[in-house]
A protein has these predicted regions:
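Thiamine diphosphate
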Residues: 138-139, 335-337, 343-345, 349-355, ...
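Short acidic loop-to-helix transition motifs that present clustered carboxylates
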Residues: 56, 76-81, 417-419, 541-545
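Active-site diphosphate/adenylate-binding microenvironment
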Residues: 33-36, 41-43, 59-60, 374-457
């Protein structure tokens, strides 16, 4: 054991000597890390989020040499979520860098979050030397095997001359088709390998990855015919429409034919909240109108949504009388949960463009169906409760919407506050609500808010809505804000419990609140935030809530506002897991 460690340590020191020495770079040669940084720049990377370590020092040395715009996270998970938040707002590939071993494993949750929500990321991990791989070297992890199930592809570079091609491929894969994360694992010796520039060829061919699907015009015609024959047509739209930037085509199509629309959590903002055709959120915490429409429709056109269990909790009794039409860019999603009557493999923008070509002959507005939707919206509207003794979180989100004219990027963590943000903020544009919709990652909120703030413009403030539980997971990332001049705002809705866990323990476990209450053990969030370099305040009186929100928004800098709410506040309505969408509880 000692000999193996000594031999590896000696070999590592020899490599370190090479790293530390100046490498003469002529116009005829380059080294792996220089090729890496140049390739990132060629692909349009403007900012990198990361955390250095032994196996990534060669990469970070090149960052120093080339003055790379890098944000030093306080944890690799934070770096991944920052890259995620940045990517969602910027509409480009986010880039994160880690070291090997624990650095790579720490970012796994962020990568899985991006994969579930189709966020384009390129994650670069340092790795031990190629001679040390498979020998349990210090900080070695088989990160390629670890990340293969949660990425679109996981590379390990075997020759430095391949780096330009691999980075080019990685960006293409991440940002095409169904978008998602890609891993590039770079061993230390590959980073310092010298390469003749004449040997580099960054061209690539991915014969098994063809995103140029021709639209099936027969399927388009069948969709139009099905809509024509329907008396109760309904559109269900999701993240696929957001990712393909097809919101205008969606709005044009819905309004041309006056078809009501419901959306998933990640489809928020595709229609403005006050659009009369927008029935609101579908599924577990969706609106009465949306869920009833899903159960009553006779023709459901799903574009860019997966029929996941938060929308279709009981697939056997979901849209039971409807002809099901599924449009998706990912063939694996079609028929996975709901077997469609008509399927169209296409991205949402292409599909909606084809559906807009030529009017549906003989179309007449479904006036009775539209009137029924208006009646359902009036029967159980999304009401903002009055505040008496305690601040109501619904009122906080409603007032925040008024104070920002519905123009803020809202970034949430996961839990009750996530649902209140979905229900009560008046969204106006797609991609405006950043949240961990698929994986449900607590701890996403703080770093994703920071990442989003690096990409947002002055017209769209960035506000993180965080629970006291999620804030405790990644609050350390607040410490970076003071170094970069960004101005994200954070609202902590503090109910002193794990709110959604608490709610489910009430509903399904006879009020047995097992290990879900923090009580007096919570830290002082104001002092904690200030210690991390961010101005903070706390509000407990309903009469002071609006002024506190106004002060937060007006402050010239980052700001944390802690809002104390009641621990028995519930998210309503709710479709219990496994129930049909019309079996809602807690209707107003």
């Amino acid at each position: 054991m000692g000999c193996l460690f000594y031999c590896f340590q000696y070999q590592g020191n020899e490599i370190l000597k090479k790293w530390g020495a100046h490498v003469e770079r002529t116009k005829k040669t380059s080294i792996g890390t220089e090729l890496l940084v140049n390739a990132l720049r060629d692909q349009g990377a403007e900012i990198i989020f990361g955390y250095p370590g032994g196996a990534a020092l060669h990469i970070y040395d090149e960052f120093f040499r080339q003055n790379v715009n890098h944000v030093l996270a306080r944890h690799e998970q934070g770096a991944g979520h920052m890259a995620d938040g940045y990517a969602r707002v910027a509409g480009r590939v986010g880039v994160a860098v880690t070291t090997s071993g624990p650095g790579a494993t720490n970012i796994v949750t962020a990568v899985a979050t991006a994969q579930m929500d189709s966020v384009p990321l390129v994650v670069i991990s340092g790795q031990v030397t190629t001679s040390g791989i498979g020998k349990d070297a210090f900080q070695e992890t088989d990160v390629v095997s670890l990340m293969t199930p949660i990425t679109k592809y996981a590379y390990q570079v075997e020759d430095a001359k391949d780096i330009p091609r691999i980075i080019k491929e990685a960006f293409y894969l991440a940002n095409s088709g169904r978008k998602g994360p890609v891993l590039v694992d770079v061993p230390k010796d590959i980073g310092v390998q010298e390469v003749a520039l004449e040997d580099i060829d960054d061209s690539f061919d991915l014969p098994g990855y063809n995103m140029d699907h021709e639209v099936d015009l027969g399927a388009v015609a069948a969709i139009k015919e099905a809509l024509l024959q329907a008396e109760k047509p309904l559109l269900l739209v999701g993240n696929g429409v957001v990712k393909s930037e097809a919101h205008q085509e969606l709005r044009d199509f819905a309004h041309r034919y006056n078809i009501p629309v419901t959306h998933t959590l990640l489809g928020i903002g595709l229609l403005a909240s006050d659009d009369p055709l927008n029935l609101g959120l579908a599924g577990m915490h969706g609106t009465y109108a949306a869920n009833m429409a899903l159960m009553e429709t006779d023709c459901l056109l799903n574009i860019g949504s997966r029929f996941d269990d938060r929308v279709a909790s009981n697939p056997d009794n979901f849209a039971p009388d409807a002809k099901i039409i599924h449009v998706d860019i990912d063939l694996a999603e079609i028929g996975k949960i709901m077997e469609p009557d008509i399927a169209l493999l296409a991205d949402a923008k292409t599909a909606l463009g084809a559906l807009l070509q030529g009017a549906i002959a003989g179309w007449s507005d479904k006036t009775d169906w539209l009137a029924h939707q208006a009646a359902n919206q009036a029967l159980h509207p999304t009401r903002v409760p009055e505040m008496t003794d305690a601040i109501r979180p619904q009122a906080v989100l409603d007032y925040l919407g008024k104070a920002t004219d519905g123009q803020a990027y809202i970034v949430t963590d996961v839990g009750q506050h996530q649902m209140w943000a979905a229900q009560y903020y008046p969204y106006q544009f797609p991609g405006q609500n950043l949240t961990s919709g698929g994986l449900g990652t607590m701890g996403y909120g703080v770093p994703a808010t920071i990442g989003a703030a690096f990409a947002a413009d002055e017209k769209h403030p960035v506000v993180g809505i965080i629970g006291d539980g999620g804030f405790q997971m990644t609050n350390q990332e607040l410490n970076i804000i003071q170094h970069y001049g960004i101005q994200p705002k954070f609202i902590i809705l503090n109910n002193t419990v794990l709110g959604m866990v608490h709610q489910w323990q009430h509903a399904f476990y006879s009020d047995r609140y097992s290990h879900s209450e923090f009580g007096s053990s919570l830290p002082d969030f104001v002092k904690l935030s200030e210690a991390l370099g961010v101005k903070a305040a706390k509000v407990t009186d309903p009469a002071d809530m609006q002024a506190a929100v106004d002060e937060m928004l007006a402050y010239d800098g980052a700001y944390v506002l802690e809002v104390l709410i009641d621990k028995y506040e519930r998210v309503t309505p709710m479709v219990p897991s496994g129930k049909a969408n019309n079996e809602m509880e807690g209707l107003s």
